[in-house]
UniProtKB/Swiss-Prot annotation:
Protein name (record): FMRFamide-like neuropeptides 9
Purpose: FMRFamides and FMRFamide-like peptides are neuropeptides. KPSFVRF-amide: Has no effect on somatic body wall muscle, inhibits contraction of vaginal vera muscle, and inhibits the activity of the dissected pharyngeal myogenic muscle system. Acts as a ligand for the npr-22 receptor in vitro.
Keyword Cell wall biogenesis/degradation: no
Family to which this protein belongs: Belongs to the FARP (FMRFamide related peptide) family.
Modified residues (Phenylalanine amide): F72, F99
Species the sequence originates in: Caenorhabditis elegans
Organism lineage string: Eukaryota, Metazoa, Ecdysozoa, Nematoda, Chromadorea
Amino acid sequence: MNQFYALFLVACIAAMANAYEEPDLDALAEFCGKESNRKYCDQIAQLATQHAIGINQEQVRMEKRKPSFVRFGKRSGYPLVIDDEEMRMDKRKPSFVRFGRK
């Protein structure tokens, strides 16, 4: 039972440490095999599982899509200045502009 527990802890810690650097699994198994270090290994295993669960939840979330159309209302007749040339924007009917697929 102690060997299985140590292997489980090693696997959890290895999963957490993979993001940072290559762990020394033999030293970790030896450290967790001692009774005096059991509480530290429990804390490490708990942190590793919480970290793994957090990563899985982030990957599962899907990104929200942008709306496929934008509605433009009537524009006011304010002057638009581009390169020192004043252009007048006329009012027009509301329209839909699609982005992407037709």
